[in-house]
């Protein structure tokens, strides 16, 4: 059994996993190890631990935070009378007896625990955050108030697993000043039995020993990276590095071969062992149609590309050959198969332990393929991905480092300009018009948004908040707004390119969905296109900070009625499912090459028709299968709409079928 890190008596609230389950409170002995948080019955008379009542795997915990105490708890949320005594003085309120609640959130919802002292609560929250810091599903937001009577008191959301309503801050368990209405009320002292456990000394923290490189993860740099601030470590493409500190954030602390240490962007490296990302022939995000186009452009016998398959976890080898007698040449796509023993093959008689070994063999032997793999084909000038911020920990940008080069346009919040950061890095600079945004709230949210990093999201680099107007600094996208791009280039698109645009947006939205982050204003006007034609989602979450009533009110002239589902139009109820609806409309915009949805109706007429069940027609460029995908986003019942994960899978299936 793993060593116990902490051991304390707390009051536990029942989790009410079933609607009929009663709400009650019981004293439990809680034990924390590196793997589990467990709670037991406790025999106070004998001072012994009783039977185990439940446990949570540490790896499943997504958040640990304080909870705002409930005001005036009703009788059903108070501790029952002691023994058979009937005096109301003996009916002790839970909040007074255990006045410091905190929550442990995991995949089944929140577990509420009440501590007798604030110091003990702080200690537990600190240790819990320490053991979960490498968990992959840590959330960005949480619910500061209790889940009671089928809803959260803080935001009235009725789904227990609903996305949080407040940005998560690292407060180590302390409530914000003034957040507890009972902050001056002293708790009752613990009983002698509890005091014996509470005063039990914690195990001493072991002295930090130097970590051997043999115990560290080794990575290889995929791109060069020049440090942007004093905390960063330089990367050289192809060099190996050891990871000293890895987290779910986009920056890792690393050590190079010379012993230098610093932070590196995690999307610039890949694991050294058996990784294929470092090879010239591998193109991770290339689609089938893009591979075919590139191979035909090269036109070389035996030209090949290894890419991610549309089937999760699979790879495909795309090969070009002229030797078949077809003057245009032909392309074959071979899925890399694997045996139960994890050996890879393209032809069953030839098994290999790694994909690089497999490719190396077929570079010398066709062995059933249309051609030997002679010539690796790759995208020219593979651009390094954007970093989450301009250096580790840098989110406040000095405006003196910015050079303004040209105006790009005017948006909801003000003028947008193209410029350079420190004369070297391309950036877009949004100059926020005073009075257009709830600035203080946005500045708090910007810290969270900077940690949202995905190749199909327009990266937020930082903000300038020391002067007015404030600036928002983002990744620069050379081809501008998707809506204008569709309208201006309308005669140059093939249907496969349109589907790839939908895939780009869906990948970004699947990522936001996994982070429980809502966009709230998804539309072609809020997507941008880079110089390689890749579409990225922009302005995610910004609509919450608009101060213009014409934009925020569902009856306002600027409200995105044409992208909104019935529950938003009628009740202003935003969720991931309202983003799904908007994505369906965005697909329609793409396939109509930038037409206005419901172009024959006014906003009020559109809202009325949507409520009556009217949906957008099939654009002539959209196949029946594509239209089925977009139509699935417009189900009247939000729960019946698919997730972005399902939508992406459906889009990839159609891409394979229609290419």
Curated annotation (Swiss-Prot):
Residue stretches making up the SH2 domain: 281-377
Protein EC: 2.7.10.2
Residues binding dasatinib: 474-477
Binding residues annotated for 1D-myo-inositol 1,3,4,5-tetrakisphosphate, in chain numbering: 26, 28, 39, 53
UniProt binding sites for Zn(2+): 143, 154-155, 165
Residues bound to clofedanol: 474-477, 542
Location of the SH3 domain: 214-274
Gene3D superfamilies in UniProt: Pleckstrin-homology domain (PH domain)/Phosphotyrosine-binding domain (PTB), SH2 domain, SH3 Domains, Transferase(Phosphotransferase) domain 1
Gene Ontology MF: a single term: ATP binding
Residues with PTM N-acetylalanine: 2
Cofactor stoichiometry and binding remark: Binds 1 zinc ion per subunit.
Topology within the bilayer: Peripheral membrane protein
Outcome of substituting residue 28 to H: In XLA; moderate
Disease: X-linked agammaglobulinemia: Humoral immunodeficiency disease which results in developmental defects in the maturation pathway of B-cells. Affected boys have normal levels of pre-B-cells in their bone marrow but virtually no circulating mature B-lymphocytes. This results in a lack of immunoglobulins of all classes and leads to recurrent bacterial infections like otitis, conjunctivitis, dermatitis, sinusitis in the first few years of life, or even some patients present overwhelming sepsis or meningitis, resulting in death in a few hours. Growth hormone deficiency, isolated, 3, with agammaglobulinemia: An X-linked recessive disorder characterized by growth hormone deficiency, short stature, delayed bone age, agammaglobulinemia with markedly reduced numbers of B cells, and good response to treatment with growth hormone.
Domain notes: The PH domain mediates the binding to inositol polyphosphate and phosphoinositides, leading to its targeting to the plasma membrane. It is extended in the BTK kinase family by a region designated the TH (Tec homology) domain, which consists of about 80 residues preceding the SH3 domain.
Protein's recorded name: Tyrosine-protein kinase BTK
Chain's gene name: BTK
